[in-house]
A protein has these predicted regions:
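SIR2/sirtuin-family catalytic core signature
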Residues: 1-42, 222, 278-280, 284-286, ...
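Short secondary-structure boundary/capping segments
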Residues: 55-63, 185-193, 250, 319-321, ...
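Acidic, metal/cofactor-coordinating or nucleic-acid-engaging core segments within structured domains
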Residues: 244, 248-298
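A short acidic (Asp/Glu
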Residues: 51-57, 180-185, 245-246, 313-319, ...
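A short alpha->loop->secondary-structure connector
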Residues: 62-71, 187-200, 307
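Gly/serine-rich nucleotide phosphate-binding loop at the start of the catalytic core
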Residues: 1-184
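Cofactor-binding loop segments of dinucleotide-utilizing enzymes, especially the Rossmann-like FAD-
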Residues: 46, 174, 237, 308, ...
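Extended, H/D-rich, highly charged conserved domains that either
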Residues: 83-116, 122, 162-267
């Protein structure tokens, strides 16, 4: 099948006289050039965690099927779900947004304890949330899931270590799962995700201004950045984040749990919609989106977009703003998002698009990107030695 690589509206492969034998090499060389830029960012969408976790379409289908067969959901609410689904094009986040709005409306005009409508609406919301939670809260020891986890590990093995004179890599993700954390922990790669503390970890966006450094000289205060480190921004929340105001030290009211669990009495932060009691406009979402915007406006930046379909207008607006105000910002979309998306209609030489017309394992799949397109940074020349040592000592 055909591999495509466009710069703006221009076919990059044609202008560089590519043939079937060197197409991938030409794309890889260009991507390698971007890694020499001062600031390298990645944006992950649901495609990076497939098939271990369903994408948004898959989540909707699972919710729809279970609502149809659930006897505890009233027919009126089943019909309400179907009506909202049609109006919101089966987008599960937007469906939840409407239901959150209805719940707040009912809560505002009547006493919740006396309202059957409020109880039923709340029941439907919790039912949907629990399905989503269960689909995301997977076991990382199951074969299908370990395959995806290994891809994440390979990704971080390739990109985590950078020259100390360059900025650390930033990973922004709309995913709520724990694949990033699992991979980083398995590889002993340091990461900052906005939480600080020991046994109890609380959200503090100031952490994104910190870095890990090591002392270079025991006699004087001389430090240099730790190379194997990344910043992780979960801009749509995480399965292991909950609201918690029990501690006086938790100024932002968000706690990171070691093991994810679902509790109807606590709000798990994996459903950010504009109508969810304005939470997506407040902390932690406002802080995370602000960081996203700030990073894209830094000079000499590149954003690699993987597995994201440009379906979140808030995220899209920040990308558009970076293109409009930062002349040194480059955007590399490695996904077949379709020509109907507004971003694909822009003729700008700072926008690159890579995809393949293949129904099996096209070049824009996460596995193929990691194995065939991403450069293997020189700093990782010791990774095989270390991996072999760890393997042998365990045996």
């Amino acid at each position: 099948m055909a591999i495509h690589f466009f710069q703006g509206k221009e076919d990059y492969l044609t202008t560089h006289h590519a043939n079937d034998d060197n197409k991938i090499e030409i794309i890889k060389n260009k991507i390698s050039e971007f890694f020499n830029m001062k600031n390298v960012h990645f944006l992950f969408g649901s495609g990076t965690s497939c098939p271990a976790i369903p994408n948004m379409k898959g989540l909707f289908e699972k919710v729809e099927e279970k609502i149809k067969t659930e006897s505890n959901i009233q027919e009126d609410n089943k019909n309400l779900f179907n009506t909202i689904s049609k109006k919101k094009n089966n987008n599960i986040e937007e469906i939840l947004g409407v239901l959150y709005s209805k719940r707040e409306f009912l809560k505002g005009i009547i006493e919740p304890e006396d309202s059957e409508k409020y109880k039923e609406c709340n029941k439907l919301i919790h039912f949907i949330e629990k399905i989503i939670f269960d689909e995301i809260n997977i076991s990382f020891t199951e074969n299908a899931n370990t395959v995806v986890l290994d891809i994440y590990k390979s990704f971080y093995q390739k990109i985590a270590l950078r020259n100390k004179d360059l900025s650390r890599i930033n990973i922004f993700t709309t995913n709520n799962d724990l694949f990033n954390e699992q991979a980083l922990d398995a590889l002993n790669i340091h990461y900052i995700n906005g939480f600080n503390g020991g046994l109890n970890k609380y959200f503090n966006p100031a952490m994104f201004n910190y870095t890990y450094s090591k002392r270079m000289d025991t006699t004087i205060d001389r430090f240099e950045p730790v190379e194997n480190m990344v910043y992780l921004y979960k801009i749509h929340g995480s399965i292991n984040w909950i609201e918690d105001t029990s501690s006086n030290n938790n100024y932002f009211g968000i706690k990171e749990e070691y093991k994810p669990f679902y509790d109807e009495t606590k709000s798990t932060l994996i459903y950010p919609t504009p109508m969810k009691q304005n939470k997506s406009l407040g902390s932690p979402y406002s802080d995370l989106f602000r960081e996203f915007q700030h990073k894209l406006l830094e000079p000499n930046s590149v954003l690699f977009v993987i597995g994201y379909s440009f379906s979140d207008e808030h995220v899209n607006d920040i990308i558009y703003r970076a293109l409009a105000t930062n002349s040194t910002f480059n955007l590399v979309i490695i996904n077949n998002i379709g020509e109907d998306k507004p971003i694909c209609k822009i003729n700008d030489n700072r926008i690159f698009k890579v995809w393949e017309d293949d129904n099996n394992e096209p070049i824009h799949y996460f596995k193929q990107i990691v194995n065939k397109l991403l450069p293997n940074l020189d700093a990782f020349k010791q990774k095989d030695i270390l991996a072999e040592f760890i393997k042998q000592i365990k045996e």
